[in-house]
Design a protein with these regions (language model features):
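Signal-transducing coupling segments at domain and membrane junctions
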Residues: 46-50, 59, 63-89, 111-120
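Catalytic cores of nucleotide-enabled group-transfer and carboxylate-activating enzymes in metabolic
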Residues: 50-53, 61, 83, 97, ...
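A short, aliphatic-rich beta-strand micro-motif
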Residues: 88-97, 104
Length: 245
């Protein structure tokens, strides 16, 4: 997946049925380093096949990576020597979003004959199918990013309102932030409880999100409350106070 600075490709999902490798997503952290799109001198990293596809937008279909010119597969050879694997055919397809911008690449290694199990080259039909899957994956990734960006925008808006409320009075400055932090701290401790009265209580990720938003918004009514009411040292309990408010 292309990072925000568009300077490198980071592995998002890695899976090998032959080697029994599953990394990324719900399968744990990926420890492989990212692929840089530029060389140290600033020139495009066309020697790496994934970087080439991301930079040019071209589909790369290689029958045998050990016998191809124009790309550097030294890292692939080292991996094969270490694991006993034999990387052969490779298909790299750029992933484009709705604006036709490249957001990542889909890389497949070693197509297999369904009848014999022999490693074969990726056929034109397989390439077309993979391009279609890459398009669907790009849509899913873009939608996920848009949702995260909307959530971040919403939270930023909430925190801006909270900051505006805190600025209204020196007596309540930082109150909303402290309440939000305390609320989430209590909720996390409750989730960690293994025994006692709260052992059966557990907040889901969505409930934790709702709780955090509620904590940030608990004083939202103060936005329109006059400063002389916010700063008042006593309760509004006399007839005079009620008439004036």
């Amino acid at each position: 997946i292309l990072n925000e600075k568009e300077s490198e490709l980071s592995f998002a999902i890695v899976q090998s049925q032959t080697l029994g490798i599953r990394m990324g997503g719900t399968s744990g952290e990926i420890t492989w380093p990212p692929v840089r799109l530029q060389n140290p001198d600033g020139s495009p990293n066309y020697a790496n096949v994934s970087a080439y596809a991301a930079l040019t937008g071209e589909v790369v279909n290689i029958p045998d990576v050990y016998y191809v010119e124009g790309f550097n597969f030294e890292g692939t050879r080292r991996f094969d020597a270490k694991t006993g694997y034999r990387s052969k055919s490779m298909l790299v397809v750029p992933m484009r979003n709705h604006e036709n911008d490249i957001i990542g690449v889909l890389q497949l290694i070693n197509a297999m004959d369904p009848d014999t199990g022999e490693v074969i080259a990726f056929s034109p039909e397989s390439q077309r199918l993979t391009e279609s899957l890459a398009s669907q994956a790009a849509i899913a990734l873009t939608n996920n990013r848009l949702i995260r960006e909307l959530e971040n925008l919403f939270e930023a808006f909430i925190k801006t309102i909270a900051a505006a409320i805190d600025e209204k009075s020196p007596y309540t400055a930082g109150h909303i932030r402290r309440v939000a932090e305390l609320t989430m701290s209590i909720a996390k401790r409750l989730n960690e409880a293994k025994d006692g009265p709260f052992a059966d209580l557990h907040f889901s990720d969505d409930e934790m999100k709702e709780l955090r938003i509620a904590a940030w918004l608990h004083d939202v009514g103060k936005v329109t409350t006059p400063e002389y009411i916010v700063d008042k040292a006593t309760k509004l309990e006399t007839i005079y106070d009620r008439i004036n408010t």
